[in-house]
């Protein structure tokens, strides 16, 4: 067994769950959950679920903003002539549809990207910026392939650039901390 990649020697055999104390059961459960969350299927599922939740909130917010503009489609102009109850029913129905649609898209994209990135990282056995860029390219091309090769190329470039920008931003905190609070 290893601890952060360092071999710690032979471990005692695992006891059956019935023979463990409550603390040992909790530690074993936490160990198994962490092991699952660090695996590729675990990362993929977590990215899909969190993308679904984030997409749902984003879709709900964007749908609520759609009724705020005075210039809109004929459907929005037509809504203002209906009674209040029908207006609310139509708006909430539309918000639910948009929210669900956005949630599905965010969840799907997050799941595909995370799965591809984890697979590339496992195959390369390296954790660097090229994993995210490659995963972004594959994900972008895969999502746009139905529209043709040019769209796949643009999708590849766009997702790779976005992934590079996000990775560069998230990895920029690796600098040493400032000497005092005034030099931030």
UniProtKB/Swiss-Prot annotation:
Transmembrane domains' residue ranges:
45-65, 151-171
Keyword terms, alphabetized: Disulfide bond, Membrane, Mitochondrion, Mitochondrion inner membrane, Protein transport, Translocation, Transmembrane, Transmembrane helix, Transport
- GO aspect biological process, one term: protein insertion into mitochondrial inner membrane
Q: Which GO terms describe its cellular component?
A: plasma membrane; TIM22 mitochondrial import inner membrane insertion complex
Annotated region Disordered: the residues are: 1-26
**Which domain of life does this protein belong to?**
Eukaryota
Q: Which GO terms describe its molecular function?
A: mitochondrion targeting sequence binding; protein transmembrane transporter activity; structural molecule activity
Q: Where in or outside the cell is it found?
A: Mitochondrion inner membrane
Could you tell me which InterPro entries the record lists for this protein?
A: TIM22 (IPR039175)
User: Do you know which Pfam families this protein is assigned to?
Assistant: Tim17
What's the protein's topology in the membrane? Multi-pass membrane protein
* Cysteines joined through disulfide linkages: 40-118, 137-156
Name the PANTHER family for this protein: MITOCHONDRIAL IMPORT INNER MEMBRANE TRANSLOCASE SUBUNIT TIM22
Q: How does it assemble?
A: Component of the TIM22 complex, whose core is composed of TIM22 and TIM54, associated with the 70 kDa heterohexamer composed of TIM9 and TIM10 (or TIM8 and TIM13).
Cited function: Essential core component of the TIM22 complex, a complex that mediates the import and insertion of multi-pass transmembrane proteins into the mitochondrial inner membrane. In the TIM22 complex, it constitutes the voltage-activated and signal-gated channel. Forms a twin-pore translocase that uses the membrane potential as external driving force in 2 voltage-dependent steps.
The Swiss-Prot or TrEMBL record describes its family as follows: Belongs to the Tim17/Tim22/Tim23 family.
Q: What is this protein called?
A: Mitochondrial import inner membrane translocase subunit TIM22
Species source reads Candida albicans (strain SC5314 / ATCC MYA-2876)
């Amino acid at each position: 067994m290893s601890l952060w990649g360092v071999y710690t020697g032979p471990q005692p055999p695992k006891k059956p769950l019935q023979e463990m104390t409550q603390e040992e059961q909790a530690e074993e459960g936490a160990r198994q959950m962490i092991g699952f969350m660090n695996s590729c299927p675990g990362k993929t599922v977590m990215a899909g679920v969190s993308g679904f939740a984030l997409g749902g909130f984003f879709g709900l917010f964007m749908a609520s903003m759609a009724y705020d503009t005075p210039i809109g489609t004929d459907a929005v102009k037509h809504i203002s002539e209906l009674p209040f109850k029908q207006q609310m029913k139509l708006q909430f129905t539309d918000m639910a549809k948009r929210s669900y649609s956005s949630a599905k898209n965010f969840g799907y994209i997050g799941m595909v990207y995370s799965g591809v990135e984890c697979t590339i990282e496992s195959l390369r056995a390296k954790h660097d910026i090229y994993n995210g860029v490659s995963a972004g390219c594959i994900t972008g091309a895969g999502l746009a392939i139905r529209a043709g090769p040019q769209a796949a190329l643009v999708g590849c470039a766009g997702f790779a650039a976005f992934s590079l920008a996000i990775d560069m931003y998230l990895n920029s905190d690796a600098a040493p901390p400032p000497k005092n609070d005034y030099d931030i």
